[in-house]
């Protein structure tokens, strides 16, 4: 449910010898990658797609980014994904830009991208997910019947803007809007699981953080009430796809839950016909 090939930007390890490349290696080590430089392989879209196929992944979500410090345009996401049926594009908007609402409608209605990613905690100024200025973003996504993806995790500059209770407030105000929480709002695992328990329109993608201390709580919840709301994600390039699939299968998910978290939940959420 979440990947970005390295060639998209230096931040994802596009250029060896840069400080960004070293940061990508560092993060890979922190989340348990066996090969901290595996992402070098995705220097082209063809190599990235080959890795997706080798990992046995039927469909991989490729997400843009639009923050004050890093932008990958939605047109670029379309260019990368459209030739490859196994790649699903998710648009991104900076909600503080004046054209944010128009860009959402363009990305969905003209480009055909499958959802909208926002990262309010990375904004200038940073915002909580429940900041009223974001309500028009949620409203237009609700009207377009597409999911909104919230990215928040330990790398959020200030974790005060990554509190799960803010997601709960949005879920209550927009009960028909699917809200997908990238990085599973780690490290606030108990809290976000509690929010997802209360609001069935909240989905969790813990991706690489499911392998860190406390991450087994996601598995425990998915073996119970969360089986329709948890989704697999690789967080590539910060974790290798093949290793992540293998490690994920060994986390202790019950057999009847695996189809949901690996495939069916994403298919339903993104209205795919795979």
Where is each model-derived feature located?
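Mid-to-C-terminal alpha-helical segments outside catalytic/metal-binding sites
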Residues: 4-55, 59, 226-229, 239-274
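Structural motif corresponding to alpha-helix initiation and N-cap regions
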Residues: 42-46, 71-74, 97-101, 131, ...
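Generic structural signal for well-ordered alpha-helices
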Residues: 45-49, 74-81, 104-105, 134, ...
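Conserved, mostly hydrophobic/aromatic
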Residues: 52, 77, 107, 116, ...
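Active-site gating/metal-coordination segments in enzymes
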Residues: 58-59, 67-150, 155-156, 198
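Conserved residues at the C-terminal ends of beta-strands
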Residues: 63, 119, 264
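Residue-level marker for beta-strand->alpha-helix junctions and adjacent short loops that shape enzyme
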Residues: 67, 96, 123, 155, ...
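Catalytic pocket-lining loop regions of alpha/beta-barrel enzymes
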Residues: 114-115, 127-231
């Amino acid at each position: 449910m979440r990947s970005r090939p390295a060639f998209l930007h230096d931040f994802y390890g596009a250029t060896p010898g840069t400080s960004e490349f070293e940061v990508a290696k560092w993060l890979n080590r922190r989340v348990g990658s066996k090969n901290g430089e595996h992402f070098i392989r995705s220097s082209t879209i063809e190599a990235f797609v080959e890795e997706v196929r080798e990992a046995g992944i039927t469909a991989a979500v490729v997400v843009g980014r639009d923050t004050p410090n890093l932008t990958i345009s939605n047109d670029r996401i379309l260019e990368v994904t459209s030739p490859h049926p196994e790649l699903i594009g998710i648009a991104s908007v900076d909600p503080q830009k004046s054209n944010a609402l128009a860009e959402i409608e363009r990305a969905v209605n003209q480009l055909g991208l499958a959802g909208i990613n926002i990262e309010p905690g990375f904004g200038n100024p940073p915002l909580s997910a429940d900041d009223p200025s974001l309500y028009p973003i949620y409203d237009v996504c609700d009207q377009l019947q597409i999911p909104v993806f919230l990215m928040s995790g330990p790398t959020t500059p200030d974790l005060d803007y990554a509190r799960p209770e803010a997601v709960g407030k949005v879920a209550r105000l927009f009960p028909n809007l699917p809200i997908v929480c990238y990085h599973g709002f780690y490290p606030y695992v108990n809290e976000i699981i509690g929010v997802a328990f209360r609001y069935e329109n909240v989905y969790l993608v813990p991706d690489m953080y499911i392998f860190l201390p406390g991450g087994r709580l996601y598995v425990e919840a998915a073996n119970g009430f969360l089986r329709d709301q948890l989704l697999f994600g690789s967080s590539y390039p910060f974790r290798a796809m093949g290793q992540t699939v293998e490690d994920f299968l060994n986390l202790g998910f019950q057999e009847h839950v695996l189809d949901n978290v690996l495939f069916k939940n994403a298919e339903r959420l993104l209205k795919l016909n795979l």
